Protein backbone atom coordinates (compact mmCIF):
# COMPACT_ATOMS: atom_id res chain seq x y z
CA UNK A 1 0.00 0.00 0.00
CA UNK A 2 2.77 2.46 0.94
CA UNK A 3 4.72 1.47 -2.21
CA UNK A 4 1.64 2.11 -4.37
CA UNK A 5 1.14 5.56 -2.81
CA UNK A 6 4.83 6.40 -3.27
CA UNK A 7 4.68 5.25 -6.92
CA UNK A 8 1.63 7.45 -7.57
CA UNK A 9 3.47 10.37 -5.97
CA UNK A 10 6.51 9.73 -8.19
CA UNK A 11 4.31 9.51 -11.29
CA UNK A 12 2.59 12.78 -10.38
CA UNK A 13 6.00 14.42 -9.93
CA UNK A 14 7.21 13.02 -13.28
CA UNK A 15 4.02 14.24 -14.96
CA UNK A 16 4.42 17.74 -13.48
CA UNK A 17 8.09 17.84 -14.50
CA UNK A 18 7.20 16.83 -18.04
CA UNK A 19 4.40 19.39 -18.29
CA UNK A 20 6.83 22.02 -16.99
CA UNK A 21 9.14 21.23 -19.93
CA UNK A 22 6.32 21.37 -22.49
CA UNK A 23 5.06 24.68 -21.09
CA UNK A 24 8.60 26.10 -21.13
CA UNK A 25 9.02 24.94 -24.74
CA UNK A 26 5.82 26.73 -25.77
CA UNK A 27 7.04 29.91 -24.06
CA UNK A 28 10.37 29.68 -25.92
CA UNK A 29 8.65 29.19 -29.29
CA UNK A 30 6.15 32.00 -28.69
CA UNK A 31 8.95 34.37 -27.65
CA UNK A 32 10.93 33.58 -30.81
CA UNK A 33 7.81 34.07 -32.95
CA UNK A 34 7.03 37.41 -31.30
CA UNK A 35 10.59 38.62 -31.94
CA UNK A 36 10.45 37.42 -35.57
CA UNK A 37 7.14 39.22 -36.06
CA UNK A 38 8.51 42.43 -34.50
CA UNK A 39 11.65 42.23 -36.65
CA UNK A 40 9.54 41.69 -39.77
CA UNK A 41 7.48 44.76 -38.88
CA UNK A 42 10.65 46.79 -38.34
CA UNK A 43 12.27 45.74 -41.63
CA UNK A 44 9.25 45.38 -43.93
CA UNK A 45 6.53 47.42 -42.15
CA UNK A 46 4.37 44.30 -42.23
CA UNK A 47 3.37 41.63 -39.71
CA UNK A 48 3.01 38.15 -41.23
CA UNK A 49 1.49 36.74 -38.03
CA UNK A 50 -2.17 37.60 -37.37
CA UNK A 51 -2.28 35.64 -34.12
CA UNK A 52 -0.72 32.73 -32.25
CA UNK A 53 -2.47 30.10 -30.16
CA UNK A 54 -0.84 27.42 -28.07
CA UNK A 55 -1.93 24.51 -25.96
CA UNK A 56 -0.84 21.45 -24.04
CA UNK A 57 -2.79 18.27 -24.82
CA UNK A 58 -4.95 17.09 -21.93
CA UNK A 59 -4.07 13.82 -20.17
CA UNK A 60 -7.33 12.33 -21.50
CA UNK A 61 -6.51 13.31 -25.08
CA UNK A 62 -3.00 11.85 -24.74
CA UNK A 63 -4.40 8.58 -23.36
CA UNK A 64 -6.92 8.32 -26.22
CA UNK A 65 -4.22 8.92 -28.83
CA UNK A 66 -1.96 6.26 -27.29
CA UNK A 67 -4.89 3.84 -27.27
CA UNK A 68 -5.69 4.59 -30.95
CA UNK A 69 -2.09 3.71 -31.77
CA UNK A 70 -2.29 0.50 -29.72
CA UNK A 71 0.20 1.74 -27.15
CA UNK A 72 0.16 1.38 -23.38
CA UNK A 73 -0.52 4.59 -21.46
CA UNK A 74 2.98 5.23 -20.06
CA UNK A 75 5.14 8.33 -19.75
CA UNK A 76 7.75 6.74 -22.01
CA UNK A 77 5.21 6.05 -24.78
CA UNK A 78 3.78 9.52 -24.40
CA UNK A 79 7.16 11.23 -24.84
CA UNK A 80 8.32 8.87 -27.61
CA UNK A 81 5.16 8.55 -29.71
CA UNK A 82 2.95 11.61 -29.15
CA UNK A 83 4.53 14.48 -31.05
CA UNK A 84 1.86 17.12 -30.51
CA UNK A 85 1.65 17.29 -26.72
CA UNK A 86 2.86 20.88 -27.00
CA UNK A 87 1.29 22.68 -29.93
CA UNK A 88 1.62 26.17 -31.35
CA UNK A 89 -0.67 27.39 -34.13
CA UNK A 90 0.32 30.42 -36.18
CA UNK A 91 -2.39 32.09 -38.25
CA UNK A 92 -1.38 34.48 -41.00
CA UNK A 93 -3.17 36.37 -43.77
CA UNK A 94 -1.58 34.97 -46.91
CA UNK A 95 -0.30 31.63 -48.18
CA UNK A 96 3.05 33.23 -49.01
CA UNK A 97 3.40 34.11 -45.32
CA UNK A 98 3.20 30.42 -44.41
CA UNK A 99 6.35 29.54 -46.32
CA UNK A 100 8.12 32.74 -45.28
CA UNK A 101 7.43 31.96 -41.61
CA UNK A 102 8.44 28.31 -42.02
CA UNK A 103 11.75 29.42 -43.52
CA UNK A 104 12.33 31.90 -40.68
CA UNK A 105 11.52 29.23 -38.06
CA UNK A 106 13.89 26.82 -39.79
CA UNK A 107 16.73 29.35 -39.46
CA UNK A 108 16.42 29.56 -35.66
CA UNK A 109 19.62 28.00 -34.29
CA UNK A 110 17.88 26.86 -31.11
CA UNK A 111 15.26 24.81 -32.98
CA UNK A 112 15.94 21.41 -34.47
CA UNK A 113 13.44 20.41 -37.15
CA UNK A 114 12.47 16.74 -36.83
CA UNK A 115 10.05 16.72 -39.74
CA UNK A 116 7.79 18.83 -41.94
CA UNK A 117 4.34 17.89 -43.27
CA UNK A 118 3.21 20.20 -46.03
CA UNK A 119 -0.56 19.78 -46.27
CA UNK A 120 -0.60 22.94 -48.40
CA UNK A 121 1.01 21.17 -51.34
CA UNK A 122 -0.46 17.79 -50.38
CA UNK A 123 -3.89 18.37 -48.72
CA UNK A 124 -5.52 15.54 -46.79
CA UNK A 125 -8.52 13.80 -48.38
CA UNK A 126 -10.77 15.78 -46.04
CA UNK A 127 -9.51 19.01 -47.62
CA UNK A 128 -7.39 19.90 -44.59
CA UNK A 129 -4.59 22.29 -45.52
CA UNK A 130 -1.88 23.50 -43.19
CA UNK A 131 1.89 23.43 -42.77
CA UNK A 132 3.20 21.37 -39.84
CA UNK A 133 6.67 21.41 -38.37
CA UNK A 134 7.81 19.18 -35.53
CA UNK A 135 10.75 20.77 -33.75
CA UNK A 136 12.71 20.26 -30.58
CA UNK A 137 13.50 23.17 -28.32
CA UNK A 138 16.37 22.94 -25.81
CA UNK A 139 14.97 23.74 -22.37
CA UNK A 140 17.70 24.63 -19.89
CA UNK A 141 16.91 23.56 -16.32
CA UNK A 142 19.09 23.17 -13.25
CA UNK A 143 19.50 19.49 -14.24
CA UNK A 144 20.77 20.25 -17.75
CA UNK A 145 19.36 20.71 -21.23
CA UNK A 146 16.14 18.90 -22.15
CA UNK A 147 15.24 18.80 -25.86
CA UNK A 148 11.44 19.11 -25.90
CA UNK A 149 9.13 18.51 -28.87
CA UNK A 150 6.69 21.15 -30.09
CA UNK A 151 4.41 20.86 -33.11
CA UNK A 152 4.01 24.13 -35.01
CA UNK A 153 1.05 24.51 -37.37
CA UNK A 154 1.00 27.42 -39.79
CA UNK A 155 -2.15 28.29 -41.73
CA UNK A 156 -4.05 31.23 -43.13
CA UNK A 157 -7.16 32.76 -41.59
CA UNK A 158 -9.23 31.29 -44.44
CA UNK A 159 -7.83 27.81 -43.74
CA UNK A 160 -8.54 28.16 -40.03
CA UNK A 161 -12.16 29.05 -40.79
CA UNK A 162 -12.66 26.30 -43.38
CA UNK A 163 -11.05 23.69 -41.10
CA UNK A 164 -13.52 24.66 -38.38
CA UNK A 165 -16.36 24.02 -40.84
CA UNK A 166 -14.84 20.67 -41.83
CA UNK A 167 -14.68 19.46 -38.23
CA UNK A 168 -17.86 20.85 -36.71
CA UNK A 169 -20.75 18.39 -36.55
CA UNK A 170 -23.63 19.31 -38.80
CA UNK A 171 -27.12 19.52 -37.42
CA UNK A 172 -30.21 19.35 -39.51
CA UNK A 173 -33.60 20.77 -38.74
CA UNK A 174 -36.74 19.02 -39.81
Which residues are covered by each model-predicted region?
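Short cationic amphipathic helices and targeting signals
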Residues: 86-92, 152
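Beta-rich nucleic-acid/ligand-interaction surfaces
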Residues: 99, 111-136
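Short connector loops at helix/strand junctions that flank enzyme active sites
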Residues: 83-85, 128-130, 145-149
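Conserved small/polar residues in nucleotide/adenosyl-binding loops
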Residues: 164-170
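Active-site ExK catalytic segment of metal-dependent nucleases
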Residues: 149-157
Amino acid sequence: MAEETAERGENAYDWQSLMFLYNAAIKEVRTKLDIMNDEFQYIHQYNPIEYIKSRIKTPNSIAKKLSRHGLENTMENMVEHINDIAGVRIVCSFTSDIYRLAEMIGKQKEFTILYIKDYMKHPKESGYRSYHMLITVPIQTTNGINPTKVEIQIRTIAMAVSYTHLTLPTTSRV
